[in-house]
């Protein structure tokens, strides 16, 4: 076992434009090869597109999308007696938010479109309206956990 101190979890600072911690998490998730300025421009233009399409505050829509995409339970592989079981476990709020962000970005990258900001805006709007691939992924995760409910007593 390590004798060193356990490092504290570091959180990014709030986004300067929207003063939101969630937006800064989104920017760091979109980040590729250290180009943070480009990632910030993508998020800002995506939020402008959301504002023009819905005539609502993009931050409110983004938070609603995160709430809609956050899973409550997930399955984890657990090896017991030579066989591996998919054990359903509850997801912490921090992990649920991170999974939602990861799925939104993953499915916005897979979308067919012109620019990343347009694809990201479309995925956020769809997720806020409870449609799209991100919501399908969440429901699929919940179905997997429901199907393996019999192994819930193997929880750790």
UniProtKB/Swiss-Prot annotation:
Family: Belongs to the universal ribosomal protein uS7 family.
First and last residue of the signal peptide: none
Upper taxonomic lineage: Eukaryota, Sar, Stramenopiles, Ochrophyta, Bacillariophyta
Cross-referenced InterPro entries: Ribosomal_uS7, Ribosomal_uS7_bac/org-type, Ribosomal_uS7_CS, Ribosomal_uS7_dom, Ribosomal_uS7_dom_sf
Keywords, alphabetical: Chloroplast, Plastid, Ribonucleoprotein, Ribosomal protein, RNA-binding, rRNA-binding
Protein localization: Plastid, Chloroplast
PROSITE patterns: RIBOSOMAL_S7
Keyword check for Transmembrane: no
Function: One of the primary rRNA binding proteins, it binds directly to 16S rRNA where it nucleates assembly of the head domain of the 30S subunit.
Source species, domain of life: Eukaryota
Protein known as: Small ribosomal subunit protein uS7c
GO cellular component, one term: chloroplast
Source organism: Thalassiosira pseudonana (Marine diatom)
Gene Ontology annotations of biological process type: ribosomal small subunit assembly; translation
Assembly description: Part of the 30S ribosomal subunit.
Matching NCBIfam families: rpsG_bact
MF-aspect GO terms: mRNA binding; rRNA binding; structural constituent of ribosome
